[in-house]
UniProtKB/Swiss-Prot annotation:
This is Glutamyl-tRNA reductase. Its EC number is 1.2.1.70. Pathway: Porphyrin-containing compound metabolism; protoporphyrin-IX biosynthesis; 5-aminolevulinate from L-glutamyl-tRNA(Glu): step 1/2. Keywords: NADP, Oxidoreductase, Porphyrin biosynthesis. The gene is hemA. The active site is at C41 (nucleophile). Homodimer. The record marks H90 as: Important for activity. Catalyzes the NADPH-dependent reduction of glutamyl-tRNA(Glu) to glutamate 1-semialdehyde (GSA). One of its GO terms (biological process) is protoporphyrinogen IX biosynthetic process from glutamate. The lineage of its organism: Bacteria, Bacillati, Actinomycetota, Actinomycetes, Micrococcales.
Amino acid sequence: MNVVVLFSLVATHADIDLETVARLSAGSAAVSTSTVVLATCNRFEIYSAAENPATARAEMEAALAHATGFAPSLVSSSFKLLTGTDVAKHLFAVASGLDSAVVGEREIAGQVRRALIDAQTAFPVPGPLVRLFQTASRTAKDVGSQTALGSQGRSIVSVALDLAGDSSATAWDQRKAVVFGTGAYAGVTMALLRERGVSDLSVYSSSGRAADFVASRGGTAAESLEEALGSADLVIGCSGSDQRVSAETLADIRRRTGTAGEPLSVIDLALSRDFDPAITELPGVELLTLETVRLAAPSEQESALLQTQVIVSRAAADFELSIATRSVDTAIVALRKHTMAVLDAEMERVRAQHGCTAAAEEVEFALRRMVKQLLHGPTVRARELAAAGQQAEYIAALQSLYGIELESPTPAAQPVESIPAVEPASCPVNHNAVDRSQSA
């Protein structure tokens, strides 16, 4: 049996610059099907299942290199390969907020959940990947209910708004805010701005989706870039579009609208950046980026972090055991079928020689009990080896000793406990009136 292995390719702000993460993310459509892609403001991760992870990785990286224009060596060096328990442990930590720029943020759990939904909408997702992401979501819920991590509701957006508020003397209810983008982060940003008292709120979308976005969320749709930036004193970039606002464009708009030199806070949360970093050279303009937020994010309590790490580690270990158990279940079922087939063939010979008698029925009953006892040891041992990560050795032994060729288990395969035992073959003779003690 060829064993399917879970693996992930991880590129995050912790290892490479956000510009590279953004360009890799832009090429995600080139990645083969049957994968789940997690792309956020500071990470691009690919989760997949393959019999040969090295080959699958090479194919994905080649596709990304072609789509992004990056050199293959740069694409390869940008990713960290995770296999085994590390895959689950990493994803569960991400979903729980442990690996975020703002530790404990809650938005990431929703992004993990949506990543699976988006993948399932596009194509069939392998069972192991579905279970991986579903378990990640459950782990995030456990962290939320059992620890104080993220209890203060901090997120990248909230910390960024805190920084913008600290640097401005204008009260929140007097600010004029514009949100760039119409995605999930834009929706979260609008909600947080309203919580702080901002009522003069506009949305700008270079793709023209602002009107539909504000129709269900409130606010005003800015029809042009000049309208969006002309009177605002707070701008939050969440779009990640290809149309980056340059320093020259912003300076020109501020000059034409008579706002040059006036205070303007720009929060750029887009992975591919909505604003050129050079805007900080303009008078009165302050730029806050994801890196700014990461450095300023308050630390969580040590006890909450430790509790979360324990929950994540246990969940990852349990998940890995469940994967190993599923793979060895197929071998256990195959061994039972093989043994029962031998028994049935032998009983056919007994009946052919001695007829369908009470004695033959007694022999069959005794043999089936013996086979059940003989299989108990190998079944228990299979579970023990699976728990130790040695299920491959067990499967190889069955193939060598009995010549049993196993097929890869399907995602919907029944666990061993739910597979009914093989019933003894029925005998057409009614032996109810026969005294079994006389047939020995």
